[in-house]
């Protein structure tokens, strides 16, 4: 599982750590790789340590070329309180990594079609996020279908498609 976010309160990284805490017994090989930087890093590291999750939650800092890491992940988590057009979500979908996100205004619901290329869960509902992650980790067929659907849904944002749309508007 991957997360790409600034390590600040608004992104609610604590919620992602809570998700892993609840799933680690059922999924002992679960791994959350968090990419990003911010002033919350020491607090989140301490939380991971307090929960004895150091083997399951890793902080990798900021990375400019992240697509390879996203493509390796089975899922992406987004727990932001508010989100514009989420480029990290779009990048994930474009490489076939489904996203489970809080359903906050704007961004996520523009990109994620609930039950097609990921899941949207109510903002702050950690238990439902746990349930959705568990569902996909337990159902490789559904996970693979979501992956295919992710790539398909991201196609509408590729350069060729956008260029054609602009040409149609300008003509």
Where are the language model's segments positioned?
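Conserved donor-binding/catalytic core segment of Leloir-type glycosyltransferases
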Residues: 1-11, 17-20, 33
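Short hydrophobic beta-strand element within catalytic cores of glycosyltransferases
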Residues: 98-102
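C-terminal alpha-helical cap of glycosyltransferases
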Residues: 159-171
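Short glycine/serine-rich donor-binding loops of glycosyltransferases
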Residues: 86-89, 108-111
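Conserved acidic donor-binding segment of nucleotide-sugar-dependent glycosyltransferases
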Residues: 113-115, 119-126, 135-140, 155
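C-terminal "capping" alpha-helix adjacent to the active site of nucleotide-linked donor transferases
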Residues: 19, 125-144, 148, 167
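Nucleotide-activated donor-binding/catalytic signature segment of Leloir-type glycosyltransferases, i.e.
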Residues: 45-61
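Aromatic "clamp/platform" in nucleotide-sugar-dependent glycosyltransferases that forms part
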Residues: 62, 81
């Amino acid at each position: 599982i991957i997360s790409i976010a600034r390590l600040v309160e608004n992104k609610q990284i604590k919620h992602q750590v809570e998700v892993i805490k609840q799933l680690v017994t059922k999924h002992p090989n679960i791994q959350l790789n968090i990419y990003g930087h911010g002033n919350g890093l020491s607090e989140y590291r301490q939380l991971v340590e307090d929960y004895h999750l150091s083997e399951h939650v890793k902080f990798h800092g900021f990375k400019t070329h992240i697509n390879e890491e996203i493509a390796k992940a089975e899922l992406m988590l987004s727990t932001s309180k508010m989100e514009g057009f989420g480029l990290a979500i779009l990048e994930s979908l474009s490489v076939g990594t489904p996203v489970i996100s809080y359903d906050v205004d704007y961004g996520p619901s523009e990109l994620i079609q609930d039950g097609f290329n990921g899941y949207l869960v109510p903002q702050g509902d950690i238990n439902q996020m746990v349930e959705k992650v568990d569902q996909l980790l337990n159902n490789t067929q559904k996970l693979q279908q979501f992956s295919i659907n992710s790539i398909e849904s991201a196609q509408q944002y590729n350069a060729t498609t956008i260029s054609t749309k602009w040409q149609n508007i300008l003509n």
